[in-house]
């Protein structure tokens, strides 16, 4: 047997192995620009993405994160229709003008109106005829004292003195109309009276309340969704596109594989304008292969996550900081962003990931404990926790993530080889507070490095440290009596 003398490629470093060197600075933390590219064509206002995990990201968390300036990736452990519906919930949750509002025909019953309002969490529905011309509007106030729910909506709706706005009305003009007429919903019609949209007072207020929100060209919150490489995933992509998804991520444990490359090519061939993220990878060769296949961003991380056991079970992986650097270096000049997925334990880890070349970070455990995550709330020994599991756990694979680990050939749970575990994380409160602290840490790091933008932070230098250096970096020789909101060991 002839052993390759270059078998040991390099010494891999991760976040706890380094610190960033401080540099001359002319910017204060509040002055830095935290916007970044998620993909070639999508820009985020903060470099944070929530992981496509079934205890992390569904519509509720995706809405909250997009309002903060990031983006959520909806997990795929659900039916195609259910995932598309989650996309619609996000896209309808906030809009400059709702492009395709929920409507009813004139002969619909009050029971239909009641059920649709309850299902979609809305307080009013435009009523149209067969030609899509606006005939009236019915609100929850119209239903409040109705006993006979078999009455047609046309008998109860507001149809006279209906306040509408012409196509092309700005949000500022719409706000004046809404306030002047003391109404909450403003149908928008074209010159033929056809309904083309709906502007609500609630949406205008959200624009004021969340000025940093990540939105598409129509003023809707952005959202992404995971797809796999199984046979039905082109159908899944089609359903997601029809629902208005902004970006899909071809989500597997080993992105440098034929199935992933073929899926990226297939999706880009069908939907050339759809932004596609591909992963997960950990080498320069993988980054180049996915970029050549047409990926608009690559996701880096094999085994760094707190609930991942891939490195232990399979013996495979690359320390995360080194992996991010290698992939970013390989794609330099190609305009394809790198996403650092996993291993973020402290706010400083995010700063280090970006300095190593990432344009954004993806996190699961960071968000698993927040109010908006879909994980089960658990009370244990008087403390509040939320459930959190890896998509490589047996429980998650049994629910649909088998193809992420290329084990979709079996339906026998006992034949699955897990690469993740199930656990719980402390409850953290609402997501906005967690994101505020993380972005605060990022701003501080940028200030120390003299970086006014994410692009400038990527030029920062590292110093390698010892285990003693890391111990020195943490609070030491003291008993903490009052915990800080942004620090834990």
Give the ranges of each region predicted by the language model.
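Alpha/beta catalytic cores of nucleotide-metabolism and tRNA/nucleoside-modifying enzymes
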Residues: 1-24, 104-105, 166, 173, ...
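Active-site-adjacent beta->alpha loops and helix N-cap segments on the catalytic face
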Residues: 30, 79-88, 146-150, 194-214, ...
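Bateman/CBS regulatory modules and CBS-like beta-alpha motifs in cytosolic regions of diverse proteins
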Residues: 30-44, 51-53, 82-120, 127-129, ...
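Short beta-strand/loop segments at the ligand-binding rim of alpha/beta enzyme cores
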Residues: 43-48, 96-101, 216-226, 267-282, ...
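Catalytic cores of alpha/beta
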Residues: 60-63, 235-243, 282-300, 340, ...
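Glycine-rich phosphate-binding active-site loops on the catalytic face of alpha/beta enzymes
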Residues: 67-82, 245-257, 296-314, 344-378
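Catalytic beta/alpha-barrel core
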Residues: 74-77, 103-104, 124-126, 164-166, ...
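Short beta->alpha transition motifs characteristic of CBS
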Residues: 74-79, 122, 126, 133-149, ...
């Amino acid at each position: 047997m002839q052993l390759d003398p270059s078998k040991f490629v390099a010494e891999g470093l991760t976040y706890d192995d380094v610190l960033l060197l401080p540099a001359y600075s002319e910017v204060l933390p509040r002055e830095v620009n935290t916007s970044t590219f998620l993909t070639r064509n999508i820009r985020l206002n903060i470099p944070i993405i929530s992981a496509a995990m079934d205890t992390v990201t569904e519509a509720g968390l995706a809405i909250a994160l997009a309002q903060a300036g990031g983006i959520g990736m909806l997990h795929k452990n659900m039916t195609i229709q259910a995932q598309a519906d989650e996309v619609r919930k996000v896209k309808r949750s906030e809009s400059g003008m709702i492009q395709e509002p929920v409507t009813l025909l004139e002969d619909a019953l009050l029971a239909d109106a009641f059920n649709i309002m309850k299902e979609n969490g809305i307080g009013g529905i435009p009523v149209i005829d067969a030609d899509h011309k606006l005939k009236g509007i019915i609100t929850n106030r119209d239903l409040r004292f109705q006993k006979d729910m078999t009455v047609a909506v046309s008998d109860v709706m507001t149809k006279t003195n209906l306040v509408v706005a012409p196509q092309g009305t700005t949000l500022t003009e719409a706000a004046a109309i809404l306030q002047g007429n003391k109404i909450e919903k403003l149908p928008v019609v074209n010159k033929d009276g056809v309904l083309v949209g709906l502007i609500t007072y609630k949406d205008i207020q959200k624009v004021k309340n969340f000025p940093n929100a990540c939105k598409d060209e129509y003023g809707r919150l952005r959202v992404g969704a995971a797809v796999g490489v199984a046979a039905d995933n082109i159908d899944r992509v089609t359903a997601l596109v029809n629902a208005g998804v902004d970006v899909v991520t071809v989500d597997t444990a080993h992105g440098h594989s034929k199935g992933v490359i073929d899926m990226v090519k297939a999706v880009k061939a069908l939907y050339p304008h759809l932004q596609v993220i591909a992963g997960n990878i950990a080498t320069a060769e993988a980054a180049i292969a996915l970029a050549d296949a047409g990926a608009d961003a690559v996701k880096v991380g094999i085994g760094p996550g707190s609930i991942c056991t891939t490195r232990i079970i399979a013996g495979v992986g690359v320390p995360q900081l080194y992996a991010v650097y290698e992939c970013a270096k390989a794609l330099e000049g190609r305009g394809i962003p790198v996403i650092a997925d996993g291993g973020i334990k402290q706010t400083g880890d995010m700063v280090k990931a970006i300095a190593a070349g990432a344009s954004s970070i993806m996190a699961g455990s960071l968000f698993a404990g927040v109010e908006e995550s879909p994980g089960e709330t658990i009370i244990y020994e008087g403390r509040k926790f939320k459930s959190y599991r890896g998509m490589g756990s047996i429980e998650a694979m049994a629910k649909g993530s088998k193809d992420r680990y290329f084990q979709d050939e079996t339906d026998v749970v006992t034949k699955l080889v897990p690469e993740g575990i199930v656990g719980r994380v402390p409850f953290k409160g609402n997501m906005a507070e967690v994101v505020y602290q993380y972005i605060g840490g990022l701003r501080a790091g940028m200030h120390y490095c003299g970086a006014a933008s994410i692009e400038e932070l990527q030029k920062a230098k590292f110093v390698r440290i010892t285990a003693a250096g890391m111990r020195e970096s943490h609070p030491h020789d003291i008993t903490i009596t009052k915990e800080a909101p942004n620090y834990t060991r």
